[in-house]
Amino acid sequence: MHTVIIGGGFAGIKATLELANKQTGKITLISNSPYFNCHASLYSILAGKSKRQSKVTLSDIFAHINGVDIVQDEVISINPEKNIVRSKDVAYEYDKLILSPGMVPDNLGISGVKSHTLSIRNLEDIDKLRKRLEVNTKEKIAIIGAGPAGVEFAGALSEWYEAIDEVADITLIDSGNRVLPTFSKTASRLASRKLRDMGIKIQLKRSVQEVKSSHIVLNNGVIPAKNIIWAAGETLSPIITKHVQYFGIEENRVQVDDFLEAYEDIYVIGDCAKASGSGTADGAIYMAEYVAKHIIHTMMGRKSRPYHHKPDIKSVPIGSNWAYVEQSGIYVSGKLGSLTRSEIENRLYRQIIPRVQAFSALNPYS
């Protein structure tokens, strides 16, 4: 059996490892990057840490795993009738296909986002921003989007300015009525307090109408800023949106059945799946484990139990020694939250990357 897996994030790597360990046949992992980016240390390069510390090559992860081909390529089409996926130059036949491409930025149709904002999705983005800020530390900064990415990055930026003995002028903007809208109201309240304690201004119920090179046009005014960071809006990967005739789409996610199957012999896992656990690293790993086990059961003629994921663990750090973590109405915050989050990340990263690299990624300031 040949399983093709698209996506080199948590879900894709974990599914590959699980299937390879059970010797299910040939496995091809296709990723458009040779690296797995370690989000735990992503923003630490603001403090000047080497980018090498924050990424691990896929070839290193699978160096001692047999039966796995790692391919750096970009799949642009899927033909489920013929069980083939294609890149620009290569056709890959599959018996089982696992899609875990993650999500991509969405400018939400707002003029100027693409040309006048900076992204913070990968290491190169962060490094580029740091170098830009070093040229003029006095320029105002606006972060559009008060979800986990925007909140975390606001805290990291504030600490960086403090470390270089500068005063940051950071404004966090969101169209909603609270920060961290997918978390509990307690999380929003505590996170807002922490952000304000760090000197970060919060503008809520402010929808962005247009982005210019020197300011943001809102529904009720203008905010001047030359460094404008986009942390709002994401959508499905083109490999999904180009093939909606095969997939059901609900709330900007791919519909899957009780076994995470979106089409015959095609499974969708990770952030882009409409399933419990979507959007979290913990959920991505659990989905990957489930799909691998289900495929093995199918090979053996056994039935699988329907997919079910425990309530999500949600967490967000604000600075290097403060974090908020919640699950099922129970939460911790502050220094204890930071320690708890570190333990959770330690468990997750050690499931997919070698021990030495995991330690380096999880201790970016050491």
Segment roles from a protein language model:
Residues 1-68, 152-182:
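Beta1-alpha1 glycine-rich phosphate/pyrophosphate-binding loop at the start
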Residues 68-142, 218, 229:
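FAD-binding core/adjacent interface of flavoenzyme oxidoreductases
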Residues 113-198, 202-204:
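Predominantly flavin-linked oxidoreductase catalytic cores and closely associated redox partners
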Residues 114-137, 224-289, 293:
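FAD-site-proximal beta/loop scaffold in flavoenzymes
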Residues 320-366:
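C-terminal auxiliary extensions adjacent to catalytic cores
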